[in-house]
Every structure is written in structure tokens, then in C-alpha cells.
Amino acid sequence: MHKIELDNNKLEKYNNIKTPEELYEFMESYIKYGIEIDGKVYEWGKDDFQKACEEKWRLKSSLDIIKSGYGHCWDQTEIERDWFKKHNYEYKTLFIIFLIENNNPYVCHTYLIYKDKKDNKWCWFEHADYNNKGIHKFNTMEEAILAQKEKHIEFNKSLNLPMTKDIIDTIHIYEYQSPKIGSTNQEFLDNIFNNAKDITKKLIKKS
């Protein structure tokens, strides 16, 4: 069991962040990939991580995630949503998944994109995906989403999973709104599948 150390200045530092770049650096310093439940940390790659996500995880508020110092992509996207919303940015939160029934081995992901206030270009803000960390800028929103899609395909392929055209064609991308605090793993997914906007076909036409 990991001991959760609370930094008394952490929330003050978060509240003083002025730019997306500062938010990224804050998350680099204070947010690690994993989930914390009742003082115990479950880390990516460990045997108990996936089971804990499916059975024990509950969505915390962005401030509680910051306090714990741990979050997987679903959690970290809520920190990002909180900051970009409070600072009046145009942004979207997105969920990408291979829609395969029965024992789906493919990894899903959530992330945020936003419009830069200086040049109106769209940026993919990525902290949870360690292979693609950073702020990546594109001319359009569609370019940002399609670039992330290609990286998502690459990552799943790196896990030695089959990546045929038929498999790629199962990818769906949803634009989703803030889920309910306290949501279980299944409730989080149900919120997306029942309420989110499926933008897959729209993107395919533009790619």
C-alpha cells in the first residue's frame, strides 16, 4: 500500500495556474497515472489494476483527484475539463474505443482538445498517455482528433493486438459531457454510450 502524501500548497498552486502550459507542468509534477482508493494506489501494468478499475473505481471530483495525486485518463480528463472550463476556453472532451463485443482486449482512452486563444488553432492536451505527452497543435479540430486516433491505433498495435482494417473500422469517437461524480466504471461508460455525441462518421468524411 502506498501512503498518500497531501501537499498543503497543491490546490493553491492549481488555482493559480494561468495557461495550458502551466496546467501541463502542474500535472507533470503532481499527477501520476493510477487510481487511488481508500489510501491504496493501483498502478498501470500491475496485476490488480484492471480489476480495481472495473470493480472499485469511482469518479472523484477534480479537486479530490488532485489531492490524491493519482488518476487514469478518465480522471485526468476531468482535471483538464475543470481548468479549461473555469478559464473560458472552447474545448471538447473525447472518448475513443474499439467497439468489439465479448472480451474486448483493446485499450480505450479519454482526452481533451481546446482552441488556443492566441491563434485559434486546436490543441490536443495529453498527460495521461505517456507515449504522447504534451500539447500538440493543429490547424483544425478534426486534424487534432484524427492525429490522436492514429496514435491510439499505434499504441494498441504495440500491445501485439491485431490491427486489420476490419478492426480499425470498429473505432468510435464520442464527444462527451461531464460525467456524474461517484460514477462506477460501468456508469461512466453508460453515460457515454447513452448520452454522448458519436462523431465518428463526421470525422471519416473529412479524413
Per-segment meaning from a language model:
Residues 1-207:
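A structural boundary/capping signal
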